[in-house]
Structure formats: structure tokens, C-alpha cells
């Protein structure tokens, strides 16, 4: 066993031991079988420790190392859909879209109902600007798992990029209903990739502001309106007369953004609070 493997096993074992168990004072009473099980958790197998080591490399953003570690495990488990998906995520983080797509396809072939891998394959197609293909993949993922806010968010991005704006708005609202903070999350290194780029940031931020406004979230509405304004979306002042903003338009935070139109906003006069 190599030194790195020993280190990974030791690290995994330490992580597996609950902190409270490590701090529990010594008892002089005879332990029960249950307490013995808590005090002496079963150590991870070398296989489990190897995957955890790779997961740690992903968390550290050491994607190349993580991919290599996952691929070593795949040598003995070539049809492990979860591992295939994780390798795909690692290569996507490295910018190798073709290799990422290859692993996502293998994961889907191994488990045709693996919604995460289908979603991730959709994000690759999105990054390649194949918006129609990405929409189809996101819909397929949602047919398998209707509870994934990230996939709804990704589908909204794809509709937006494809200029299907009403569908984008409807999908964003579904994502927000499941997770109000969905647009504030980073893509991360998990098994489900979240899209983070868009074709027209200013307009996109305006759409997100509108979705939050319809949900009655004034704070986030103001935040995304400001992003839209600062990114150069010249129509951001239309929020003042857009019925979608009616629930939050009088909120001081929203009004503050609308009271300071930038120079590119044209001759529209500064509006007072209603």
C-alpha cells in the first residue's frame, strides 16, 4: 500500500469519527453493544477511502488530480455511473468539454435514469451553444426528477439563450419556488452542474429581478435590478410600469435602484416614489 493511500485511509477514518465521540470522557461502566458501535465505527475500506480522497481533491479544486483518482477506481468498476459522472464534472471544470461529455454519456448508458448525469450533459451542450439540445436534455432530466431546482434553473438559462423568454420566466419561477437562493449559489464541485453563464447578462438579470418580484422578494429584486442597470440594460426602468413588479415596486430598496438611472438610460426622468 502506497503512502498516499495510507494517508487517504487515515484521513477518511478521522473524518468518519464523530467529533462528539472523540471528546466523550472515559466511562468505567461496561459499554453496551450500541455504545461500542458508536465508539468503534467501522473503518472505511480502501475503495471507499480512495473515492473520498478524490472527492477531497474536487473540493480543493484540484480537478486533474481528482479525475485521475476517479479513473483509477473506474479501472475495476467501468460501469459505475456515479463515478463516471464525477469524472465528467472534473473534466468540465478543467474546460475539457469533449471529455466531460464522453463520461456523461457513459454514465447515462450505465444508468438511463440518472438525472444528474443527463443534466450535466445538458450543461456541456449549453456551453457549446447547442441550446436546443440542452433544452431537450434538461427536460429529460426533469421527467425523471421533478424536485431539482438546479435543473429548472439550467432549463431557464437555455430558454433564455434560445430567446424563448416566456418559457424562461416560467421556468425560473419554478426554480425559485423550490429554492429562493438558487441564483446566488456557486456552480460548486458537486455531482450536479449549475449553469453560470448567459448570452446577455443585463437582460438576464432583469428577468431574474422580475422572477423575484413576482415571488414578492423585494431585497433580491433590488439586487438583480441593480446588476441589470450596472450591466447596461437600457430598459431596466421599465420595471416602474411592469405589472410583474407590482408587489415590490414601492419597497424603498427597489425605489433606490430606480432613482439612480445611469447615463445610458436615456432621457427618462427620475421618478419619485408612489
Q: At which residue positions do the language-model features occur?
A:
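Alpha-helical segment of the N-proximal tetratricopeptide repeat
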Residues: 45-82, 86-96
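Structural signature of tandem alpha-helical TPR/SEL1-like repeats
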Residues: 60-72, 93-106, 127-140, 162-174, ...
Amino acid at each position: 500500500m502506497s503512502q498516499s493511500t495510507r494517508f487517504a485511509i487515515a484521513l477518511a477514518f478521522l473524518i468518519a469519527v464523530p467529533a462528539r465521540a472523540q471528546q466523550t470522557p472515559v466511562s468505567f461502566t461496561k459499554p453496551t453493544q450500541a455504545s461500542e458501535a458508536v465508539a468503534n465505527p467501522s473503518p472505511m475500506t480502501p475503495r471507499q477511502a480512495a473515492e473520498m480522497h478524490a472527492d477531497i481533491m474536487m473540493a480543493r479544486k484540484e480537478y486533474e488530480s481528482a479525475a485521475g483518482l476517479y479513473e483509477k477506481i473506474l479501472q475495476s468498476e467501468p460501469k459505475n455511473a456515479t463515478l463516471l459522472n464525477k469524472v465528467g464534472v472534473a473534466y468540465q471544470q478543467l474546460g475539457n468539454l469533449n471529455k466531460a461529455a464522453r463520461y456523461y454519456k457513459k454514465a447515462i448508458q450505465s444508468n438511463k435514469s440518472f438525472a444528474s448525469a443527463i443534466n450535466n450533459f445538458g450543461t456541456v451542450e449549453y456551453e457549446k451553444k447547442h441550446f436546443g439540445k440542452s433544452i431537450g436534455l434538461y427536460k429529460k432530466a426533469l421527467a425523471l426528477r421533478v424536485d431539482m431546482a438546479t435543473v429548472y434553473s439550467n432549463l431557464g438559462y437555455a430558454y433564455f439563450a434560445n430567446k424563448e423568454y416566456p418559457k424562461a420566466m416560467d421556468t425560473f419561477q419554478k426554480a425559485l419556488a423550490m429554492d429562493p437562493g438558487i441564483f446566488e449559489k456557486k456552480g460548486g464541485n458537486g455531482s450536479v452542474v449549475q449553469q453560470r453563464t448567459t448570452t446577455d447578462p443585463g437582460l438576464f438579470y432583469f428577468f431574474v429581478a422580475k422572477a423575484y418580484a413576482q415571488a414578492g422578494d423585494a431585497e433580491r429584486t433590488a439586487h438583480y435590478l441593480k446588476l441589470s442597470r450596472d450591466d447596461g440594460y437600457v430598459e431596466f426602468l421599465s420595471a416602474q410600469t411592469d405589472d410583474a413588479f407590482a408587489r415590490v415596486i414601492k419597497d424603498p430598496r427597489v425605489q433606490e435602484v430606480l432613482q439612480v438611472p445611469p447615463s445610458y438610460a436615456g432621457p427618462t426622468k427620475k421618478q419619485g416614489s408612489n
